[in-house]
Amino acid sequence: MAGLRGLLVDLTPLRRSRDFRLLWGSQVFTSLGRQVTVVALPFQVYVVTHSSLAVGLIGLAQLLPLLATGLYAGAIADRVERRLVQLAGKSTAFLAAAALAAGAGLHFGVWWFYLWAACGSAGATLDQTARAATFPRLVSRGQYPAAAAMNQMLFQGAAVIGPSLAGLVIASAGSAPAFAVEAVCVIPSALLVLLVSRQSPAHDAARIGWRAPVDGVRFVLGRRLLVGIFAADLIAMILGLPLAVFPALALSVFRLGPTGLGLLYAAPGAGAVVASLLSGWVSRIERQGTAVIVAIVIWGAAIAAFGVLGDVLPIGLLLLALAGAADVFSAIFRNSILQLSIPDAMRGRMSAFNLIVVTGGPRLGDLEAGLAAYLVNPVFSVVSGGLGCVAGILLLAGLLPELRRQRAGVQDQATPSSSTAKTSVALGGIGPTPRDP
């Protein structure tokens, strides 16, 4: 039994910290609602346009406000009471979800969905940045890996339940009620945030200004290890993420209907849930940099294999589940490496930078996948993306030995990657951000 407990996810942060329980519970509702929209939005756009490229352009619509607000949202989270920043983001997300529901019910054109997808992205950026900057305050340093694993388990659980629920709701009632689910979920999420203890800004936080985003960029660019961590995630998401072609595969190629579409979106989350539940061993892995590389190779190979064998639905779902498991282990190890790199005064800015990578990468991945499907076909988009991911991460591993050599508990010493290292800060901290839609 002791050996089995060592494999299962560590629930200590949930037991010991009231505020962690509240914020974690708030995120349950937020993630569930967003994951329903993750299916409903591309479904609606594909039904209106019958174009994978149009679906991919959702990613571009979401990326622009993410970039525009991301780093400044981090600076705000470093200077303003973080619960208020979260509530501002949740209010914006509520309006966006309600507008999407109205647009689907009234059969508005595709421009309406691009517009409110952008607004929802801005709201999610505010919410997620402040939340990610708050989590590390709520647990002890020794519980950071367990807290990161629990956050991943939460998101991936929502990534199974949300898409499955979306498929059922869309099949029975259409996409408008599916969008309404997110609006409803925002309400208890906001109430739980209000119950969290006041989260005052750090005393040494930088003043909000136009140079605030530059501080975060310099902090990353001054450390080759951090450059490698963020580049690895971008390679996996931009090249290997096939979500934008799922509507075409499910509705036009495999003929699975809305319920089958929900299964495709849910399968990676199912694999990730199993991986999260069996994540108790991750703290014992010494060579965490190598673990990131191996996990991303498995992710890319599984995605490419799905493109070849996905017409056999059970095999396709298993391959997507394997990819999801690899992704969650990659995220856990990347976040563990980040723990010793971020001071509390910069957590907001660095959480925003991390957020831009882990959510901006998938948006670019949507655009890449949709464009490849438009130029060739959806199957080519999936296979070429997976193989490109494998090649890209192996190339990165060769170019950045710091990533390969990184070991657990070894603090990054700010190995210069450019002249910006002269202005970098060398302090310890954490800024893990679970991947969100």
Regions found by a protein language model. Give the residues of each.
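Alpha-helical transmembrane-bundle signature of multi-pass membrane transport and export proteins
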Residues: M1-D436
